Amino acid sequence: MILDASTKQAWNLYVSQHAREMEEFIQTWDHKGCAQFKLEKIRCDWNPSRRMSRGGLYSSKGIRIPGISIAMSRYVPTYGDPVRHYEYKSFDADKFIGGFYTDNMEHPLLAVIAHEVAHAIQFWLWWYNGTAYGKPHGKEFKKHYAKLRAVFVNPLLPDQNEMGKAYRKHKNIVAKEAFFTPVEVIH
């Protein structure tokens, strides 16, 4: 899908606004360093070859700053068909922070923003408090991600049983169409 500059700019603003809302929410958390948390870098990368998003600490003029970089071409919202948003295998089945079904592609984009902001606060707190780094998708990450998902993503999601049925039906129809496409036979 080719998007014009103004459409990309609108989606960049969407990402920035939601990341800022998450930043403000984190600043209310009762944990040393949260009040000082500020996303100094919010980047939307539209390069189609960019497949992975990132959140964490970046270096700017020798200073460590929290930030996120979102691989946008993978999450450009399209609407209509049900999709399955996957999370990392270790927690994809988790009912609260795992994968989900939706027919609104803003939902996976919001989940990716929340996921990367969770990494940014995770790494920020490790650096700010001088504590040892833990696992990137360990308990601390999951705790931060769960808080963000509870406020910014999960309340928007459709009924997962119904959407899961719609997704499986859609995938079955698509698979059957691909399998049973008539082929002209030349004798």
What is each residue range found by the language model?
Residues 116:
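Walker B catalytic acidic pair
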Residues 1-111, 120-187:
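Active-site-proximal or metal-binding-adjacent scaffold patches in catalytic folds
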